[in-house]
Amino acid sequence: VDDLKGKKVAVEKGTASHTYASKNLSDADLEVHDTITTAYESLEQKKVDAVIQDGPGANFYIKTTPDSNLEVVGDEFNQGQAPYCVAISKECKYYDEINAAVKVLIKNGTTDELYAKWCE
């Protein structure tokens, strides 16, 4: 993160990365985007020097964007985030079924496989 001093850094508005950058990168020129896609487009077009996003999201973007020559660099840093989750209303008629299915996916290793495929 210290390497970003004096650099132009893009973030998505309203995200944990936006909050983190606002608090911790006072020496950087922060560029706030409405979407993470436009932040990455600015990086591809060399309009910014870096994008800050959570690791799984960054890795997913890179893996699923044809012709992207981006890569995740530097050490990961904690933005105070909790692990990823599935959020549904407790009033959803499939609430119990969804919870049971997620528990099965965790237990049988499917979530680990998906994470390795899309987020590493």
Where are these regions (language model features)?
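Proline/Glycine/Serine-rich low-complexity intrinsically disordered segments
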Residues: V1-E120
